[in-house]
């Protein structure tokens, strides 16, 4: 797989897109609580994107062999690993939910962020999973440098996860961003 090396303008475009995606997460964070549905969160995210002049990369996205994705974001509750579809089931205390936001700026840059939320008091196992996942993410980020390979990132994350009694999901290994959703 080849990676397109971005120039300064491209990096600035990606940073702005990711900042805007993070802004969506910041705006919806106070609403992620018991009794709220992920469909309500999805609708709110669409309003935030419209107000900031971005649009969702996920709504209508159709990978080969699948129907178009219906949500403006992905909401993965509890056992759902990723790409959960927003639904009308209310969140409850003890749930964990990952919200994945991908925006497209008017200039065509994609920004992709996700954030994990603990709904009320969660189990010790859920809290541990969230904390170790966060630490694994930063360990992966620390591997990014000129000359490093994508495999270095994955290896560091996998070694860390397995060293703490967890595993990685081999079917989903991440993707790049730029002017294409899954660059």
Feature annotation, model-predicted:
Residues 1-183:
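Active-site neighborhoods and metal-handling regions in enzymes and metal-associated proteins
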